A protein has these predicted regions:
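N-terminal export signals
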Residues: 5-27
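Aromatic (Trp/Tyr) and acidic
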Residues: 29-113, 142-166, 207-228, 232, ...
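C-terminal beta-rich recognition modules with glycine/proline-rich loops and embedded aromatic residues
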Residues: 52, 233, 274, 329-420, ...
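Helix-terminus loop motifs that line ligand-binding clefts
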Residues: 97, 110-143, 173, 285-293, ...
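Asp-box/WD-like beta-propeller blade repeats and closely related beta-sheet repeat scaffolds
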Residues: 139-146, 172, 178-204
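Solenoid-like repeat scaffolds
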Residues: 241-244
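A surface-exposed beta-strand-loop module
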Residues: 449-470, 476-485
Length: 584
């Protein structure tokens, strides 16, 4: 069976990968997948780094080990069997798995035979009261009850994602039953008393376990139009609060649910709430230079978390979709090309990075298979769906990644060579009469130019796009230094943040390395650098520095995009460089 390609469905995106360019662990995963009936892909062209990232995580979820996502392993949290970590978060892992594969199936046109079996087995374990997992204590809820609510919230979202893929009355019935359970407990839980009782100190079992129900309730309202779910979602949205030290993933998920409620109702109040919260995050001091966010808000800012990075990326994509304000798309791209990519392990997992006191990622070492890996997989569908926007007679190409679209009479495929030469090629397969293609110019691009069928054109819009047209988008990029404190700089090439990795520079590390002084004027590209699918050869360069330990000897370091972490075992990174004042 050919697993080298995908088939697009309406309003979806289809992509493929080039296995020969994958690192050995990922290549082995693809080859192993071909030997099992885990996924059924359809023929279709397309090669590139972005789809390779999707396939890397997809294949890890379907066929990976350490641990393997078997049926019984997934169901342990709805059976409340303590055979693995975090089964008290009842429905968390199982719900994320269902949601990630359902969304991937819709977006990429793939089929996952195991999906229906897991869904049917899950809903068969629902309590008569409507919830899943261990016993729920109505009268005196404790941390385990909040954990159960968290997992049930993720499961509600997963069931609704499955219903969007396959409108199954039994699955929708289970989701409604779970929604009615939330209605039943709402008078107690949607209160300031509960918010105070489960403060940020409770972390993963804090009050965000309740507020994150907005996402599932908004989806349930969209499917049923039952006003009870809309009203409860709206009331919970009023309880969303960014508390010091609280769980970022839970907070951002709550906001995404409020934004979903805006999308389904058109009520600007919810959009205004989310945009105000976005401004608060941006000015909080907790927005990292990688474009990501920490696992916990300050003063507990110690690690990153893949789930939170995915939420921040998805929230910005959603805000751009709702407002068409370029600032949201610019941040989404910064997050994807840096924090999201850096957080993806060579195994396909997502997880945690260690932050220093300045909020800089030093290493990404903890694979969080219990949440982040599946949340990462779910995010690829949103990324792929965001690349093109089809709005009647105008098509927008917003996100320069490998992607396909087939919607409203328009069909096209984008193949990215951005990391090598700054180009993205768009092949138009179908277009309606009078349709126009417009290309977004991101903030990181010095200039964007278009060629249509080999001929340069002026501007960023093409009138009368037609089937058979080949559009090449050229993104001109250069090195930019941005201040980090008074004497240090962070270096960017195009959308990529550059860093000094221990893998590329095995002799660089030392006790005084933070005091090394760099001459930015000596940066030069590295010619002929070996290309692998997760490398960014266009951004790589070398730079001279004065060693704090041996200043009289000339020294040079290699800087690469932090996104290249995916191609390697966990490494240590230096993300900012002190500037040598003597270099001018």
């Amino acid at each position: 069976m050919n697993r080298r390609s995908f088939m697009a469905q309406a309003a979806g995106v289809a992509l493929t990968a080039h296995e020969a360019l994958l690192p050995a662990p990922a290549r082995a995963g693809v080859q192993a997948l071909d030997r099992v009936a885990g996924a059924v892909s359809q023929p279709g062209p397309g090669v590139g780094p972005d789809v390779s990232r999707y396939r890397l995580t997809r294949d890890r979820v379907l066929n990976g080990t350490g641990p393997a996502y078997t049926r019984d392993f997934l169901l342990a949290d709805v059976r409340a069997i303590p055979e693995r970590r975090f089964t008290n978060f009842s429905g968390d892992l199982s719900g994320r798995w269902i949601g990630a594969l359902s969304a991937s199936s819709r977006s990429f046109g793939e089929q996952f035979p195991m999906l229906q079996d897991v869904v049917n087995s899950t809903i068969a374990l629902q309590h008569e009261d409507g919830y899943f997992g261990g016993k729920f204590h109505y009268d005196q809820p404790n941390d385990d009850d909040l954990a159960l609510l968290w997992g049930n919230g993720r499961l509600l979202v997963g069931l609704m994602e499955y219903c969007a893929l396959n409108p199954d009355p039994a699955v929708l019935g289970a989701a409604i039953k779970l929604g009615d359970f939330l209605l039943r407990i709402a008078p107690r839980f949607n209160s300031q008393a509960m918010a105070d009782a489960f403060s940020a100190d409770h972390y993963a079992s804090s009050y965000i376990c309740w507020t994150q129900q907005t996402e599932g309730l908004a989806a349930l309202y969209a499917a049923t139009r039952d006003e009870r779910y809309r009203k409860l979602c709206a009331e919970i949205s009023k309880r969303i609060s960014r508390r010091p030290g609280d769980h970022v993933h839970g907070y951002l998920t709550s906001l995404r649910g409020a934004l979903d409620l805006h999308d389904v109702t058109g009520d600007a109040a919810y959009l205004n709430q989310v945009t105000a919260a976005w401004q608060d995050v941006v000015h909080s001091g907790d927005l990292l230079i990688t474009g990501g966010v920490p696992e916990r808000w300050s003063p507990k800012r110690e690690r990153t978390e893949g789930c939170a990075e995915c939420d921040w990326l998805r929230l910005n994509l959603g805000l751009y979709r709702a407002t068409a304000d370029a600032k949201y798309l610019d941040i989404a791209q910064e997050t994807y090309f840096n924090e999201f990519s850096m957080n993806q392990f060579a195994s396909g997992d997502f997880g945690h990075g260690k932050l220093n006191t300045a909020g800089l990622t030093e290493t990404v070492m903890v694979r969080a298979w219990w949440c982040c890996t599946l949340h990462g997989l779910r995010t690829f569908a949103d990324l792929n769906n965001a690349a093109f926007r089809v709005m009647k007679n105008e098509v927008f190409f917003d996100f320069p990644i490998d992607s396909r679209v087939s919607s409203q009479g328009f069909a096209a495929e984008a193949k990215s060579d951005l990391a090598r030469n700054g180009e993205v090629r768009i092949d138009v397969h179908a277009a309606g009469k009078g349709q126009r293609l417009s290309v977004f110019k991101p903030a990181w691009a010095d200039r964007v130019t278009l060629r249509r069928n080999g001929t340069a054109v002026s501007g960023l819009s093409l009138e009368g796009i037609a089937a058979g047209d080949v559009v090449v988008v050229q993104y001109d990029m250069s090195l930019h230094a941005k201040e980090f404190g008074a004497a240090a700089r962070r270096l960017h090439f195009g959308p990529w943040l550059l860093g000094i990795s221990s893998g590329a520079n095995p002799t660089y590390s030392g006790e005084l390395q933070a005091q090394n002084l760099f001459d930015l004027s000596t940066f030069r590209a590295i010619p002929g650098r070996a290309l692998s699918v997760f490398q960014v050869p266009a951004a790589a360069g070398q730079m001279r520095y004065k060693s704090a330990e041996f200043p009289d000897q000339p020294a040079e370091v290699e800087l690469v995009a932090v996104a290249e972490q995916t191609a390697n075992p966990p490494e240590t990174w230096q993300l900012v460089v002190p500037v040598d004042p003597a270099a001018g």
